[in-house]
């Protein structure tokens, strides 16, 4: 008791000491090491997002073959997005019909569950194979990748897609067109299976209701690797005898497996599984048992896996890396086998330690795998555990659960490193660096927050595109694109190097943080990735929210007034580890009551007069301070006045008289000046001018015209037919002037007349043309100019494609003289010539890319073309020399059989024709596959012993006798032979069945409708599985429950255009109510 009191006192003292010394606690806090965290606000400018109205659960992401588009599957929707900016290319709504929803509601499911959740999204060539839960009635479609609305086939999603959106599943599509799916095959999810369908191989599945094959699995991923298809999942450990625990598994099947014959029909004969170990080593290892996600690096044959603790355990996660060789080694080792339910699990030697899916070439089991069918029934679980590359997990973290993983291989300055992106269950992505040589430990480089503060939700999917270094994240309400190289995020050299980011380094020349590809020279590129980055714990202080306004008091001299006050604290956050204190006031005061006070008086204003009695003014205001919020106003006057200049007499008053009238304008038109005057009374010194001027009569003067009289007629030195010409002159002048005397004679006018020499007609101006009269204005010796003849056309400036030529003439025939008129018109003329285009020689364009091979097998060809269009030959130019098409052979390997066997010939029709048919067994025929007709006809072939009725009527007596030669003796002989042959066949079948009566209780069976009663004395010692291991059950139910359209082992492509509702067998009807 005393010791307890001492301990309590110590803890109490320690608490009091911490309260009294907070600086010591802060110092400890600032010395801790944390990884950098990029907030949603910081990463926001780098993100690209896509959202769609009413679309949620963006859980399926894949890329088109050209890696230019992102295909997204959400609830009730399919989307095609641009990889660059996630802009929408196409959106297709894929919703359940009302009848399907009502059927789902009737089975007790909620509205949220009865939707179409996309769970399979696979790209095969130019097609998109996708499946959805379709309100617990799964359905699959085969669409065009370039147009999602174009549906080529629609088939049932049973065994290809889960019924419930809560069930985990995985699927892959091989190059041969086979679909491998791992999912639940029934409505309640009690029949899990790894199932193969489509393609040319028969459908197969794991044994039904056999916990040694699959025991409540959660499927994670699947990969097509070499001869095998690998599946990764977690399940309840059937080999664990003490309680219930979950183990992680790697399973594989051969891709050429066609099932068994008599045993394991429609069932895998090559299915094997092994446990995956991911644990923290120690005297008592700490196991991470539950596999959550995987990522396969085919270049290095490495598989990264995320493992967590059980859901009811402490949260912890780890990343373990497995080599394919280690997985293959486990499958080559011994099996773990339990003889019966009371026996222990013991190792059993592997009959085929180096099994590589070889097949039997001849005999009864031709084309079956080399594995013995009885061994395939018994030996499922491998004894050895698959160990990771390193004994310690590559990365571990407590108090956290990872859900998805993606891996990128990055070339650093000195070495290759692996970058692991881990999605957490609370909506962040952790970026971890793992060295390849394992000489140093892994580092958590940063954690990216995809949601604002205080908002958390799990990540639905994670896909990485190595060619563009981007990460795509599927969330509930949107898709996010995150660039992996964000070197511009680091502004200084210290932050760039200190980030320890393998993608980034400091370029000494450009003086900025760049990626290795952006750097000008590796020698000038600095990078350090030898340590782990630490988070800067310095926190600058920021104020919190203001408190509500509260009443408070203040003292104003001797008076006390009331105010409203509010405060805020520097605690959002408080400054830590050397951070800045908050800037700004921590308290605000408002609405304080205040009494008014007078300001001091202003100075007296100048006197209102310079002489004689005037007055002066001074003022003050009630603003020192202004009364506010109920304060007292000022008492007294705010203005005072007084007289001034009482004794200063003014001198006599001098003033101007009024202005006199305007004097006469100096001009009658065209603008003049006029003046007016005034007189200064009582003195000579009045301010201002005594004369004022202004413009007047600004209107324009009228136009005046003055013409001189004609001069006498005078003869001109021009004669005509014995007569002569005479001329006379006068001058005319026009102007706008106020005085007509200012006009002067200007322009000369000439007038001519003709006088006959005989004096009979006198002189007259009649008959003189205007041109002659005009010419008469000049001297008699005036010579007008005239053009010479045109010269020949000059040579064309171009040989083709439109040139120019010209010709000239000169004004010298005669030249104008003595004031004669010059030549009229141009002296130079231009004309187009050689207007035909120039010939153009053709030139080949660049070769087009090679086309796809015309056939996937059996010998096809691909080709490329070019055209004589760079430029094309024209106007007589030479054509291109050479071939415009090149072809080459491709895919010369022989094709697998794509047609089913021909059916039997039909009965002879009335038209005398028999018909038989065949079907294409490929869902995706390519090239020459399934070429030819699906039906074939021929004329009827009659039996030689059959004679038509028409022939009987016309037959001879000899023919009748020939038909009657088959008598009773022949019938007895045939009957005895048939009886003996039947007995022999019955004996052979009985002997064969006795041979297999001792087969293992691991035979694949389904639940019988009415199982045989068991011995009650040992019922308590036999597990549920042993109830269905009897020989009788094997005889009655030696086949698996396959999909109806696949019971014949082959997929019927002609049924894919229909929509199938799920069909349950009789033995499954009792589960429909769950």
UniProtKB/Swiss-Prot annotation:
Its main location: membrane. The chain crosses the membrane at residues 969-989. One of its GO terms (molecular function) is chondroitin sulfate proteoglycan binding. InterPro entries: Plexin_repeat (IPR002165), PSI (IPR016201), Sema5A_sema (IPR042821), Semap_dom (IPR001627), Semap_dom_sf (IPR036352), Semaphorin (IPR027231), TSP1_rpt (IPR000884), TSP1_rpt_sf (IPR036383). Coiled coil: none annotated. The keyword Isomerase does not apply. Residues 1-22 form the signal peptide. Residues 540-593, 595-651, 653-702, 707-765, 784-839, 841-896, 897-944 form the TSP type-1 domain. It is a single-pass type I membrane protein. Residues 990-1074 are cytoplasmic. One of its GO terms (cellular component) is plasma membrane. SUPFAM superfamilies: Plexin repeat (SSF103575), Sema domain (SSF101912), TSP-1 type 1 repeat (SSF82895). Glycans are attached at residues 142, 168, 227, 277, 323, 367, 437, 536, 591, 717, 933. Disulfide bonds join 104-114, 131-140, 254-357, 278-320, 487-504, 496-513, 607-644, 611-650, 622-634, 665-696, 669-701, 680-686, 796-833, 800-838, 811-823, 853-890, 857-895, 868-880. Residues 23-968 are extracellular. Keywords: Developmental protein, Differentiation, Disulfide bond, Glycoprotein, Membrane, Neurogenesis, Repeat, Signal, Transmembrane, Transmembrane helix. Residues 35-484 form the Sema domain. It is found in: Membrane. Binds PLXNB3. Bifunctional axonal guidance cue regulated by sulfated proteoglycans; attractive effects result from interactions with heparan sulfate proteoglycans (HSPGs), while the inhibitory effects depend on interactions with chondroitin sulfate proteoglycans (CSPGs). Ligand for receptor PLXNB3. In glioma cells, SEMA5A stimulation of PLXNB3 results in the disassembly of F-actin stress fibers, disruption of focal adhesions and cellular collapse as well as inhibition of cell migration and invasion through ARHGDIA-mediated inactivation of RAC1. Belongs to the semaphorin family. This is Semaphorin-5A. It comes from Homo sapiens (Human).
